[in-house]
UniProtKB/Swiss-Prot annotation:
Belongs to the IAA-amido conjugating enzyme family. May catalyze the synthesis of indole-3-acetic acid (IAA)-amino acid conjugates, providing a mechanism for the plant to cope with the presence of excess auxin. This is Probable indole-3-acetic acid-amido synthetase GH3.12. The keyword Oxidoreductase does not apply. Induction: At very low level by auxin. It comes from Oryza sativa subsp. japonica. Expressed in roots. InterPro entries: GH3, GH3_C, GH3_M.
Length: 613
């Protein structure tokens, strides 16, 4: 932003980005046709499309007639060949420069996806667009961002390609970092040097992010991370280690116990520079006065204008805690992207996280949308076919042929399908979205949930969203209980469909804040019963519980810090802490996480909601 006659005006870069956004969203149908034509023309000779008989055709009709809608499992053998060193044009004509890895939080196995220069440049423009909208909504002067960003370990595939998270692939790209640094105004570099981001030790990296953020507190204009969870984890750590951080600032040297990597110590030394007892004293007074740490962000970073991270989907649970930490500082939901590619931009950044919508970028990919039937819970259960009534998961509509980007209907639900420059052709993303409106000819999407069924024992079908509703319903009992003097609250949760015994049953794991871990036995039993009843909104579940085809729901209360152990388990396996999303259901194949959860269990409750005798 630039100053002119006392008013903030947009920089040249932001003006160009806004013009591009308006142009492409206005001409969305033409842009989509051209995007598909470019993808297919560029990749006309690749093996996958030749096998399907596309024969160089580039129109949407021929493409849809010959190329099937697929999942990752369908493309994985082709991707594996590329990773193993097959240099022929298997999925893309352009060279594959790296492999991107998903977080792998649900099944315990990380998906592999192709990364190339097209995705790099699309991501660069995506980030520039994000900055432009943020700068328009929250104009700031030059300063810094307290950015909780973490690189992940990389592996080398059999074919010699680097495999890591998509964000790490971007951060390791000289073109990406140079493009971000080349912005004119405002200049908002991270508080932390890159050595901190790429520290091999997550706890060391987190500690140094906090240390650098406190040392440069007056310059901080924003607090950000890829996901809300990362900011919450960081500020929870601050609650524990603020005295150590103040001691480091007082003596002008990082704790040798906390910061052990030589390159990281060298990188933060110039920021520490010299002992600063005055700053240490001021920080100690502010931290000591916080009490429950409400408003810690404006207390320690008074010039922060906003807090930005993805706050939709599985991140919704952390919004309440993040709002607690942020005080009056606005929460800004990040944009809509995935390991597969960029999708939409949050163009209405003043909207609260609970109502954020994303405007699809028509030239990021070729988009299709599978019509879905929303959950139906008002039908009566049929004793002979309980699964037919009240299914709480989204299913394909009767006429489920995918529709184009500009043909979606406001108010309807869809699953996103993408065709990209990185070798994904009619790829089911697995995301359920609701069309909230249009910006010119381009739809604005509200993220609803992941479509995947996460809890099922018999004929029951419960999704991630259903789990969230059940936990939220029980949390109201916890919050409103007159005996809950120590104000227990749910810090985090996950679930598991346990079929190791007959009948199988749902297990929900809670970590609690407030009071002692073993407090609240009476109210927690009621919470357990309430979750069991809430899942009964799915007629298949309710009928199965009544007939004992599904056993009593089990609530396991975990030791404080248990979910931090889950995070560390994934980081130790090569996942990035910055891209970590708590798995809302842990599959039986994810034995390592189940072991962490079971080892940290301190109390167990079984539902009595269906005990009638």
């Amino acid at each position: 932003m630039l100053e002119k006659e006392g008013k903030l005006i947009m920089s040249r870069e932001d003006e160009e980005i806004m013009a591009w956004f308006e142009r492409t969203t206005r001409d969305a149908a033409d842009v989509q046709r051209e995007t598909l034509r470019r993808i297919l023309a560029e990749n006309a000779g690749v093996e996958y499309l030749r096998e399907l008989g596309l024969a160089g055709l580039t129109d949407a009709g021929s493409f849809r007639a010959r190329v099937p809608v697929v999942t990752h499992a369908d493309l994985d053998p082709y991707i594996q060949r590329v990773a193993d060193g097959d240099a022929s044009p298997v999925l893309t004509a352009k060279p594959v420069t790296a492999i991107s890895l998903s977080s792998g939080t649900t099944q315990g196995k990380r998906k592999r996806l192709l990364f190339n220069d097209d995705l790099l440049r699309s991501s660069i423009r995506f980030f520039h667009a994000s900055y432009a909208f943020t700068n328009r909504a929250f104009p700031v002067e030059d300063g810094r961002v307290l950015q909780f960003m973490y690189g992940s370990r990389h592996e080398t595939t059999k074919g010699g390609l680097t495999a890591t998270t998509v964000m790490t692939n971007l951060l390791r790209s000289e073109e990406f970092t140079a493009s971000m640094a080349a912005r004119s105004r405002p200049r908002l570099p991270s508080c932390s040097p890159s050595e901190v981001v790429f520290s091999p030790d997550f706890d060391e990296s987190l500690y140094c992010h906090l240390l650098c953020g406190l040392l440069l507190a007056g310059e901080v204009r924003a607090v950000s991370a890829s996901f809300a969870h990362s900011i919450v984890v960081a500020l929870q750590a601050l609650e524990r280690v603020w005295r150590e951080l103040c001691a480091d600032i007082r003596r002008g040297a990082a704790s040798p116990a906390r910061v052990t990597t030589p390159a990281v110590r060298r990188a933060v030394a110039p920021i520490l520079a010299a002992p600063n007892p005055a700053l240490a004293d001021a920080l100690e007074r502010r931290c000591a006065a916080l009490g429950d740490w409400s408003g810690v962000i404006p207390a320690l970073w008074p010039n922060a204008r906003y807090v930005q991270a993805t706050m939709t989907g599985s991140m919704e649970h952390y919004v309440k805690k993040l709002r607690h930490y942020a005080g009056g500082v606005p929460l800004v939901s990040g944009n809509y992207a995935s390991s597969e590619g960029v999708i939409g931009i949050n163009a209405e950044q003043h909207a609260p996280p609970e109502s954020v919508v994303f405007t699809v970028l028509p030239d990021a990919a070729y988009f299709e949308f599978i019509p879905l039937k929303p959950p139906c819970t008002d039908a009566a259960a049929d004793d002979d076919n309980p699964a037919a009534a009240g299914s709480s998961c989204y299913v394909d509509a009767d006429d489920a042929n995918p529709v184009g980007l500009t043909d979606v209907v406001v108010g309807e639900h869809y699953e996103v399908v993408m065709t990209t420059f990185t070798g994904l052709y009619r790829y089911r993303l697995g995301d359920v979205v609701k069309v909230a409106g249009f910006h010119h000819a381009t739809p604005k999407l509200r993220f609803v949930c992941r479509r995947s069924l996460i809890l099922s024992i018999n004929v029951d079908k419960n999704s991630e969203h259903d789990l969230q509703l059940a936990v939220d319903s029980a949390a109201k009992i916890l919050a409103g209980d007159g005996e809950n003097h120590k104000q227990l609250e749910i810090a985090d949760y996950t679930s598991h469909a346990d079929t190791s015994s007959d009948p199988g049953h749902y297990v929900v794991f809670w970590e609690l804040n407030g009071g002692g871990e073993e407090d609240g036995g009476g109210v927690l039993q009621r919470c357990c019963d309430e979750m069991d009843r809430a899942f009964g909104a799915d007629a298949g579940y309710a009928q199965s519980r009544k007939t004992c085809a599904i056993g009593a729901l089990e609530l396991r209360v975990l030791r404080r810090g248990a979910f931090q152990e889950v995070l560390r388990h994934y980081v130790a396996g090569g996942s990035s802490a910055g891209q970590f999303k708590m798995p809302r259901c842990v599959a039986p194949s994810n034995a390592g996480v189940l072991r962490v959860l079971k080892d940290n269990t301190i109390n167990i409750f079984f539902s009595t909601a269906y005990d009638y005798d």
